[in-house]
């Protein structure tokens, strides 16, 4: 049953759903299909996490800027790719930190509110985007992907055709 229907989308309910995940065994391609033929809980959870990655898209005079909050992530956790020539894909995975206090056996979480797991955003780039001039910078937990624009095509000058006398 969907917990969001009852307003129970809380860290506790998310943790309970995670605990109730049953291994899929041989349930379909890439873990997308469970034993019952429907999507697995893990697949649905990942799809939800991917859809919950907010981004700002800016149209600047010479470039497009895609701004995504990435708190606590290292550059090695983030992947920026261009697929099928015009599809910008920003993806990665957030993991729990492995600090010394978490390695102790006596450590237990009293509250788990930070979102962990996979994230992904896809953007179709405009025709005037220069896919060969893309840069990505992650500073203070904010990823900025800049895609430069191609220069506008020069207007075609009319071609004059000489009329000959026959």
Swiss-Prot record:
Any single biological process term in GO: protein folding
Keyword Cytoplasm set for record: yes
Gene3D superfamilies reported for this sequence: 2.60.40.790
Subcellular compartments: Cytoplasm
Expression triggers: By heat shock.
Similarity-based family: Belongs to the small heat shock protein (HSP20) family.
PANTHER family, per database record: HEAT-SHOCK PROTEIN 20 FAMILY MEMBER
Protein name: 18.0 kDa class II heat shock protein
Gene name in the database record: HSP18.0
